[in-house]
Amino acid sequence: MRNAALPSIAVGFFDGVHLGHRAILEGAEAALTFVDHPLTVLAPEKAPTILTTFEERVRLIDRPVIALPFTQCLAEMSAAEFADRYLKGYKVRCGENWRFGKSGEGNAEWLKRYGWEVEVVPYVMHEGAAISSTRIREALKAGKIEDAEAMLGRKVTVSGVEVSGKGEGRKLGFPTINLKLGVYAAQVNGERAVVNYGYAPTFGERGWTEPTMEVHLLKYLRKERQFDSPEALKKQIAADCERARS
């Protein structure tokens, strides 16, 4: 199956499309991924909160994508059937821990044994450890925006439905990314901003949805808290804005 003319395909779930994923994607002419995380079928109780929606992943992969719905049928497929059906005619680029087929029986060595040309891309490191989607999730849960940004290789971007309250301000409902609750310095439509991610405890859950918007998070400012009055909240917002500008 070795043939210099074969196109290369990068394989993986690519959640977040971080620097490690980009190393795998580099030089590949196409990418093979799953629409949903495999654990949503294999072990739903262990399925992680995803960093990027499917649409965002495809945009960030930035090359032709073969997207497979991860179904129970696919989970039961042998490595031989999966490789024959989806990898035939390609040179494969993958990460060190990539596996495929029922119970993960297939990997890079399996493919090489059966004649595939495979390039295993080493882990990309950050502060002495391999970059992974799990590490980025943990950084975001801890409010460590700078660490997440360093591993992603870009600004932390979240997309969500804008919810407008009764003149009290605006908040965002994010369907995917799991962030530490609190107030963030951010950038919206090119302008510096302060964004509250949480439950708006001072005013309660009032509001209506408006079009989806995109926010670039810059740094974590403080925990979310309830204020005794709208005036106290406004004073704190002014202080938050001053910190966001610094």
Model-derived features: where do they sit?
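N-terminal catalytic cores of NTP/NDP-binding nucleotidyl/phosphoryl-transfer enzymes
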Residues: 2-53
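Phosphate/ribose-recognition catalytic cores of enzymes acting on nucleotide-derived substrates
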Residues: 163-246
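Glycine-rich, Lys/Arg-enriched anion-binding loops that position phosphate/diphosphate groups
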Residues: 107, 114-196
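Conserved beta-strand termini and adjacent loop/short-helix elements that scaffold enzyme active sites
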Residues: 1, 32-34, 67-70, 121-123, ...
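A non-catalytic, amphipathic alpha-helix used as a structural packing/dimerization or gating element
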Residues: 23, 56, 147-154, 232-243
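N-terminal Rossmann-like or analogous alpha/beta NTP/dinucleotide-binding catalytic cores
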Residues: 40-119
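Residue-level signal for inorganic ion chemistry
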Residues: 18, 61, 92, 148, ...
